[in-house]
């Protein structure tokens, strides 16, 4: 697979700082299990390399990254609420058994 360079990505994202932010957010998403958007992603590629490949291929933008982050936050909040609700039920069951 061809080597990806920062210059390839700068053709898509004009600002180096923005490129670093976009690539780091996407790499974190990929490391957490989000599926890559490029078909020929090598299993040996690290998340950072995959993120740069996606940027260079124009598969992602800030809107997509924000959308994925929002979905992950909502999922985490839902899981936290479910866990808290289960704890409340367990506490109620324990207090009933103490009576």
From Swiss-Prot:
Pfam families: RNA_pol_Rpb6 (PF01192). Keywords: DNA-directed RNA polymerase, Nucleotidyltransferase, Transcription, Transferase. It is an enzyme of class 2 (transferase). InterPro entries: DNA-dir_RNA_pol_omega (IPR003716), Pol_omega/Rpo6/RPB6 (IPR006110), RPB6/omega-like_sf (IPR036161). SUPFAM superfamilies: RPB6/omega subunit-like. GO terms for molecular function: DNA binding; DNA-directed RNA polymerase activity. It catalyses: RNA(n) + a ribonucleoside 5'-triphosphate = RNA(n+1) + diphosphate. Its EC number is 2.7.7.6. GO terms for cellular component: DNA-directed RNA polymerase complex. One of its GO terms (biological process) is DNA-templated transcription. Belongs to the RNA polymerase subunit omega family. HAMAP family: RNApol_bact_RpoZ. The RNAP catalytic core consists of 2 alpha, 1 beta, 1 beta' and 1 omega subunit. When a sigma factor is associated with the core the holoenzyme is formed, which can initiate transcription. Promotes RNA polymerase assembly. Latches the N- and C-terminal regions of the beta' subunit thereby facilitating its interaction with the beta and alpha subunits. NCBIfam families: rpoZ. This is DNA-directed RNA polymerase subunit omega. It comes from Xanthomonas oryzae pv. oryzae (strain KACC10331 / KXO85). The gene is rpoZ.
């Amino acid at each position: 697979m061809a080597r990806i360079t920062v210059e390839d990505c700068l053709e898509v994202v004009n600002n180096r700082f923005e490129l670093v932010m976009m690539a780091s957010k996407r790499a974190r998403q990929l490391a957490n299990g989000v599926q890559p958007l490029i078909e020929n992603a090598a299993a040996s590629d690290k998340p950072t390399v995959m993120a740069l490949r996606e940027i260079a291929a124009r598969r992602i933008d800030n809107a997509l990254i924000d959308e994925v982050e929002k979905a992950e936050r909502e999922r985490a909040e839902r899981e936290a609420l479910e866990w808290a609700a289960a704890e409340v039920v367990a506490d109620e069951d324990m207090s009933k058994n103490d009576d």
